[in-house]
Regions:
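Extreme N-terminal starter segment of soluble prokaryotic enzymes
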Residues: 2-6
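Glycine- and acidic-residue-enriched helix-capping/strand-helix junction motifs
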Residues: 17-31
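Short beta->alpha junction loops
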Residues: 49-58
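Short, electropositive alpha-helical surface patch
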Residues: 59-76
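Short, hinge-like loop/turn segments at secondary-structure boundaries
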Residues: 67-68, 91-92, 114-119
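Mid-chain, well-packed structural core segment of small domains
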Residues: 71-106
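Short, glycine-/small-residue-rich phosphate/pyrophosphate-handling segment
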Residues: 98, 107-148
Length: 148
């Protein structure tokens, strides 16, 4: 069986991890997190085709449209609460994805209770901090194994 591939998408402001509200999001940078994701993926026999971050909705959608992956891990940041277009793109590419959030948005400001992605994701991992990304990889690896 060919190695299963995963793309990791991070939305607006996640490039500021490590400095943006560290009391909420922690002190690890996005590059450090991407390193942990790549290391764990290797241990699980998965290939990370890209760890992509953009502050622009259209760039995230364009990356999805490349369809060069078997599954995705998506931390859409604030777009979670506003982007019908990102939801539509995730549905259009017809690849399973796990939604990840470092915090639990539903326990924060009222506007964060709206979520356009959770009901179309195969799972949502929220409030587990950086560990949520590796948990998403483990979930995808198990899913791939069951379907092999």
């Amino acid at each position: 069986m060919a190695q299963q591939t995963v793309v990791v998408l991070n939305g607006p402001n996640l490039n500021l991890l490590g400095t943006r509200e560290p009391q909420i999001y922690g002190r690890q940078t996005l590059d450090e997190i991407h390193g942990q994701i790549r290391a764990r993926a290797g241990e699980l026999g998965l290939e990370i085709v890209d760890c992509f971050q953009s502050n622009h909705e259209g760039a995230l959608i364009d990356r999805l449209h490349e369809k060069d992956f078997d599954a995705a891990i998506v931390n859409a940041g604030g777009l979670t609460h506003t982007s019908v277009s990102l939801r539509d793109a995730l549905l259009a590419v017809n690849r399973p994805f796990v939604e990840v959030h470092l915090t639990d948005p539903s326990t924060r400001e009222p506007f964060r209770k709206v979520n356009f992605l959770a009901d179309v994701a195969i799972a949502s991992i929220v409030g587990h901090g950086v560990r949520g990304y590796t948990e998403a990889l483990e979930l995808l690896a198990e899913r791939f194994k069951r379907r092999a």
